[in-house]
Amino acid sequence: MRKHSLDRWLLTAVLVVLLSSSSSFAAKKDAKKKKKSNKEVTYDGTSLIIDGKRELLYSGSIHYPRSTPEMWPSIIKRAKQGGLNTIQTYVFWNVHEPQQGKFNFSGRADLVKFIKLIQKNGMYVTLRLGPFIQAEWTHGGLPYWLREVPGIFFRTDNKQFKEHTERYVRMILDKMKEERLFASQGGPIILGQIENEYSAVQRAYKQDGLNYIKWASNLVDSMKLGIPWVMCKQNDAPDPMINACNGRHCGDTFPGPNRENKPSLWTENWTTQFRVFGDPPTQRSVEDIAYSVARFFSKNGTHVNYYMYHGGTNFGRTSAHYVTTRYYDDAPLDEYGLEKEPKYGHLKHLHNALNLCKKPLLWGQPKTEKPGKDTEIRYYEQPGTKTCAAFLANNNTEAAETIKFKGREYVIAPRSISILPDCKTVVYNTAQIVSQHTSRNFMKSKKANKKFDFKVFTETLPSKLEGNSYIPVELYGLTKDKTDYGWYTTSFKVHKNHLPTKKGVKTFVRIASLGHALHAWLNGEYLGSGHGSHEEKSFVFQKQVTLKAGENHLVMLGVLTGFPDSGSYMEHRYTGPRGISILGLTSGTLDLTESSKWGNKIGMEGEKLGIHTEEGLKKVEWKKFTGKAPGLTWYQTYFDAPESVSAATIRMHGMGKGLIWVNGEGVGRYWQSFLSPLGQPTQIEYHIPRSFLKPKKNLLVIFEEEPNVKPELMDFAIVNRDTVCSYVGENYTPSVRHWTRKKDQVQAITDNVSLTATLKCSGTKKIAAVEFASFGNPIGVCGNFTLGTCNAPVSKQVIEKHCLGKAECVIPVNKSTFQQDKKDSCKNVVKMLAVQVKCGRGKKN
């Protein structure tokens, strides 16, 4: 028995040792693996250094709350395919802590999920923490409750603001650390930003502003997270913060890093101009963007971020004052996440060209030559080697210029830069687009646009409301960001002897408002509405009225279009009606601001009851819409989801101003009655993400402020970019895709490097029709080409032969392809090839 016991004991001991050794080996292996995945991020005067390697960084801003989690994977994937290796995002304090101490990291607020998706795609992350972000986002990302902290002043050396900011900053960064998302932990976050464009307000706070910036710098630096930190538009950023540039042309406007050991970083290269209600269409050409990026990299830049790369949607009430629901739609990826060509493709080619220059840019010695008034040569080379890259710039906006460099002559197009990754071969020119173009189409849905059965519920105009103020309550403080709407009521008496009797003398109500909009009623009669604009928020509403002897009752509805998102002393910004008077009385002007008490309440009854949801619908009595309704009316109907899987929109034809919900989800604010100088609404289509929709019986609820609208004119549409074009000149540089870099030499991938035009349909679609083709001097843009005075007659025939029925086609751009009889009726014309095709799925489309 003792022997058997001893044997068992020995066996157990051996097993313990073996298991212990195995566990120890596994632990060491895991530790080694973890250590290997951790990346140290440092920097010097040339670039960021990630895991010991210098990097050129092409980054794009994508904001997680401005798209849905279902959209994130495709948006991030397309960003990577566009040549980006980094995604930049703000962190939105008022999204994550809408109420003090109550946090939200779910749905569109799931920051961790968003960052992990970026990591899954093998990309880096730049985290712009705030606390203030601007971003055309309501209140600049600061939560409303912060305004009500006693004694607080935002963004300065203020105890209360710093205490709340530190708590927020530590909460976010601790969360990132817990999820091991910093590069030093093996995560994708390589760079952080604290504060945002502070120099714009610093002067207002004097020494307190300087103290605050130093405090913010010390706060993030003290957390020792293993990543560098930047401050944008902050040339005096304290060490170790890296001062970075924001703007359109940082290659010319950025004074450079404030220390020799800091790299040149560009945190915002604006891809377009954000739009506000009342704006006409605006755009920034991709040629200008490409020129600015090439120039920045030619002048020691090693990081650029496109703001925005995908703008997305300001869902619900999240936009800043007057900002449209659609955000940065002209970015390389449009509001729906579709590739906007040629902006997407031309920048992708730029990134390819810069990558061919990577070694010279990061390790070469910079040199500059100025051969002419409008020309410049910047190049990087390593003496004694073949490593060399050059940027030949022509700043003449009217004419091409010839530049002689290293024994060769190069013709450079007007206001452009040619990139030579070996100082010999031109692989890219910023003004010569060889990538395809697209035109976006909104196709009326057959499935969703069945006859709508609208039902309506109209808000009741309040009578006398409780209140003791002789001055109308400030509207931001009244609504507390719970609603866009605040009611004001007052009563005033007019003696019959004070009513005008003289012919031509009339009485008027005048309301001076600080913004944003208002509606007014006198004695139950609707007087009308007024509004300011993004540039001029204050306005005066004046209307002729009929007063009665005795008591008169005035009702005003103050309307917000979002909170301000910029400027100093934001916590003291005011809006809403401020001065109200009655003009035309024989006794003189009656100032209701001083002589009457004002009652208040906030919001619509429908909002409080949640009648934009299925559950809330039952709480009020809906009536059938008979074709006409007053203002402040709710409209509801049901619709089936639009066909296909394409992005869906609602077009708000016939409507005025208000809010949209689908299945309880806030689509955003619309404002069709605020026309641009072109006589059109700034935004017509409003994005309904597919994740908001069910196959059938989707609830549409609209709150409309204005009377006599026509909801029957609204419709649903699906979005595509099935109109695909090319516009290539015969003297253009062939695509950079022909080139690669091997053993420090730029080499052609193919035997024949020739100029071609490429047309490619999205998904599984194929080219179904050639809608336009001309080799000559055609004019116009994709979606609207016309023939010029010169055209090869066989142009369409050639394109049809190359392209019909194919998902992708490549067309040689040369005279021999289009002038098969070798006759050229316009020899002195430099030929352009313009092609427009339609993609589809045949009869099933």
From Swiss-Prot:
Family annotation (PROSITE patterns): GLYCOSYL_HYDROL_F35, SUEL_LECTIN
Residue span, SUEL-type lectin domain: 751-840
Matching Gene3D superfamilies: 2.60.120.740, Galactose-binding domain-like, Glycosidases
Location in the cell: Secreted, Extracellular space, Apoplast
Top-level taxon in the UniProt lineage: Eukaryota
Gene Ontology, cellular component aspect: apoplast
InterPro entries, sorted: BetaGal_gal-bd (IPR048913), BetaGal_jelly_roll_dom (IPR025300), Galactose-bd-like_sf (IPR008979), GHD (IPR041392), Gly_Hdrlase_35_cat (IPR031330), Glyco_hydro_35_CS (IPR019801), Glycoside_Hdrlase_35 (IPR001944), Glycoside_hydrolase_SF (IPR017853)
Enzyme Commission designation: 3.2.1.23
PANTHER family, A to Z: BETA-GALACTOSIDASE RELATED
Leader peptide range in chain numbering: 1-26
Catalytic activity field: Hydrolysis of terminal non-reducing beta-D-galactose residues in beta-D-galactosides
Catalytic residue positions: E197 (proton donor), E268 (nucleophile)
Broad enzyme group: hydrolase
Glycosylated residues in this chain: N104, N269, N300, N395, N752, N784, N814
Keywords: Apoplast, Glycoprotein, Glycosidase, Hydrolase, Secreted, Signal
GO MF annotations in UniProt: beta-galactosidase activity; carbohydrate binding
Pfam families named among the record's database cross-references: BetaGal_ABD2, BetaGal_gal-bd, GHD, Glyco_hydro_35, SUEL_Lectin
Source organism: Arabidopsis thaliana
Protein name (database record): Beta-galactosidase 11
Gene Ontology biological-process annotations: carbohydrate metabolic process
